[in-house]
Structures are given as structure tokens and as C-alpha cells.
Amino acid sequence: MNLFDIFLKGGIIMWPILLSSIIGLAVSIDRFLMLRKAKINVPAFMVRIRGFIKKKDISGAISYCIEEKSPVANIVRKGLNKYRYGHDRVKDAIENAGSQEISKLEKGLSVLASVAGIAPLLGFLGTVTGMIQAFMTIEELAGAANPSDLAGGIWEALITTAFGLIIGIPALALYNYFLGAVKKLVGEMETVANDVIDVIQDDGRSDADIDDDVEMEL
């Protein structure tokens, strides 16, 4: 008996379980690739960004952010695009960009959580329908059923439960893994956002101090 034969013995409930597994796998692959692209060396990134801002090379900083292609770099880039309008506009742009990037990072996680919850429930539903089938067989045979007569219902009950758990457990584990990775990225985004805002604010204060000194000398 091969895997396909076992699948068929699980009955009609196996098809929605199979569908949920395909959806869960697709979401997991998509999120894995997204997280792989989103990784960035935050300390090294901030060293470069601070250097650009100190030198007033905002276009260079923006170009560097475009090269990095990560959520962290994206929020900094969108903030620096508003650099000429002042500190407050930069802060607002970074906050708005942060909300957008968080939504992108969390995309699909609710679907994966649903798969983790629904797959085992479908398995238990298959258990119920399988047991109903077994008891109907007993009733039809007036209580004279032998084990082979009940095998079909028992097969369905056990196989659907097993496959539901086989799909649900990894889906739950992957959901928690991706959720933790997203939280880590969000933390990095918040840290970088605050650092960039502070650097711009400090740089603005330095310029103001220089202007004051020039006026006093005059």
C-alpha cells in the first residue's frame, strides 16, 4: 500500500486537508524568502547612514538604502526623502513607512495560523465521520459485523486525524517562528528609525549653533 492509497482511504475530508497543506507550504516559502531578503547588518548600516548624514550627502544615503532593499532601509529612505522639509516631516515619513513595512512583513501569517488551527480540526472531523461510518455498518449488519466490515470507517478516522496533525503541528511551529522573526525585524526598524531621527535632529542643532556663533562674531 502506497501513500496515495492511504490518502484515498482517508475519505473526502483528506482533500481539504491536502488543500490546507498546499496553502500552508506556499505561505511558508513566501515568508521564508521575504525574511531572507529582509536581513540586514544594522550596526554597519547605521555607520554608513550616519556618515552620509554628517556629510550632508542625503542623495548618497538614499542610494545606499535603495541598494540594501530591506524593510529597515526602506523606512530610512522614505524618511530621508523628506529631509529638506525638516525633522518633523522626516519623523512622520518614517512612522508611516514603518506601518507599511510591518503590514508587508505580517502578510500571510494569519493564513498560516488558520492552517495550523483548521488542519487538526479537519482531521478530527474525519475521525467523527469515520466512526459514524463504522457504526452505520454495525447497524446495517444487525450487530454481526466483523473487523473487516469496520475497517473502512476506522481507516478514515485514524488517517484523517494523523494527516491533520501532520499538517497542523509544523504549520503552528512555522507560524511562531515567522512571528518571532517579524517581531525582531520590527524591533530593528524601531531602533534604526529612532537613531536616524536623533542623528538628523543633532545635525540640525549643530547647524543652528554654528549660525549663532557666526551672528555673535558679526
Range-by-range predicted roles:
Residues 1-44:
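Hydrophobic membrane-targeting segments
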Residues 11, 25, 61, 76, ...:
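Residue-level signature of catalytic and energy-coupling elements of molecular machines
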Residues 14-27, 113-123, 167-171:
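Alpha-helical transmembrane segments of integral membrane proteins
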Residues 29-34, 169-181:
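Alpha-helical transmembrane segments of multi-pass membrane proteins
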Residues 39-125, 129-141, 174-218:
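Predominantly long cytosolic amphipathic alpha-helical stalk/bundle segments
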Residues 137-156:
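Glycine-rich helix-loop "coupling/hinge" segments at transmembrane-helix boundaries
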Residues 155-173:
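Hydrophobic alpha-helical transmembrane segments of polytopic membrane proteins
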